[in-house]
């Protein structure tokens, strides 16, 4: 390989590195924009998710309350049965 061929190859490699550096800078800018300025689609999705989680939490609390109320009623019913027998 002659000296001129080596220099041409070296210039091609340097050009590719410059292109890669430029692409990485563009990627960094896009990622920073995504981090600091979230898109409306992401925010809307998170709002919908927040509503669904709130609904599930409310239903869960209601279910636990219903179970505890049933247990309390069952215990009162059993204690009432024993009081009637005496």
Curated annotation (Swiss-Prot):
Coiled coil: none
InterPro entries the UniProt entry points to: DASH_Dad3
Keyword Cell cycle: yes
Alphabetical keyword list: Cell cycle, Cell division, Centromere, Chromosome, Chromosome partition, Cytoplasm, Cytoskeleton, Kinetochore, Microtubule, Mitosis, Nucleus
UniProt subcellular location: Nucleus; Cytoplasm, Cytoskeleton, Spindle; Chromosome, Centromere, Kinetochore; Cytoplasm, Cytoskeleton
One cellular component term from this protein's GO annotations in UniProt: mitotic spindle
One Gene Ontology term from the biological process aspect of the record: mitotic sister chromatid biorientation
First and last residue of the signal peptide: none
Subunit (UniProt): Component of the DASH complex consisting of ask1, dad1, dad2, dad3, dad4, dam1, duo1, dad5, spc19 and spc34, with a stoichiometry of one copy of each subunit per complex. Multiple DASH complexes oligomerize to form a ring that encircles spindle microtubules and organizes the rod-like NDC80 complexes of the outer kinetochore. DASH complex oligomerization strengthens microtubule attachments. On cytoplasmic microtubules, DASH complexes appear to form patches instead of rings.
Function: Component of the DASH complex that connects microtubules with kinetochores and couples microtubule depolymerisation to chromosome movement; it is involved in retrieving kinetochores to the spindle poles before their re-orientation on the spindle in early mitosis and allows microtubule depolymerization to pull chromosomes apart and resist detachment during anaphase.
Family: Belongs to the DASH complex DAD3 family.
The protein's name in its UniProt record: DASH complex subunit dad3
Gene name per UniProt: dad3
């Amino acid at each position: 390989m002659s000296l001129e061929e080596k220099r041409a190859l070296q210039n091609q490699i340097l050009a590719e590195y410059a292109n890669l550096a430029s692409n990485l800078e563009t990627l960094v800018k896009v990622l920073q924009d995504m981090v600091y300025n979230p898109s409306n689609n992401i925010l809307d999705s998170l709002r919908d998710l927040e509503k669904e989680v709130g609904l599930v939490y409310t239903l869960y609390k209601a279910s636990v309350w219903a179970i505890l109320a049933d247990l309390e009623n069952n215990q009162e019913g059993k204690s009432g049965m024993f009081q009637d027998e005496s």
